[in-house]
Amino acid sequence: MLKNMKFKTSAFNIAQLLETEKKQIVLVGKSNVGKSSFINSLANQKHLAKVGNTPGKTKSINYYDVNNEFYIVDLPGYGYSNMTKVEKLNTSKLINHYIEKNENISHILFLVDIRHKPTENDRIMYDWLTSKNIPFTIIATKADKIGTTKQKENMQVITKVLFAKENIIPFSSSNKLNLDIIEN
């Protein structure tokens, strides 16, 4: 667990993005993939990041300070159909600007749901991340929802659909599966 992790601020538009020299580890993934639960697991706090039952809860870029040394940054999920076209466009611009203009991103954690085949949006995100030359790791969330054999099968599907060259780490916020590996 990351000690002394606390919420710092939210950015709903480009003007609100945090200007900092601190390194940033960024979470990306589709809506309802478990980014907020992932943050809560890292911090060993149940309510640090607000977890929603409906997709699209996070509509801002949220910064979490870790030991006053670096930030975990939670980006809004993509693929949420209940956003208006204007909201989708504004969110897309915000995310693009954040990643394109930010020289302090040290790593990206790309979260996918292990229970489901990656979507076209996941594939687009994977290709986009690959083009950015920023180190990233694929985290397959919600691993506790399926058995070990199914986890292995589904990780192969994820690898095949994304054409992923990276290792995929199965993760569960419920039983903290592989939390120690991810923290390192």
Where are each of the predicted segments found?
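Short, glycine/charged-enriched secondary-structure capping and boundary segments
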Residues: E21-K22, N40-A43, K85-K88, R123-D127, ...
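Conserved nucleotide-binding/hydrolysis micro-motifs of P-loop NTPases
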Residues: K57, F70, G77-Y80, R115-K117, ...
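Amphipathic alpha-helical transducer elements in NTP-driven molecular machines
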Residues: K88-S92, T119, K176-L179
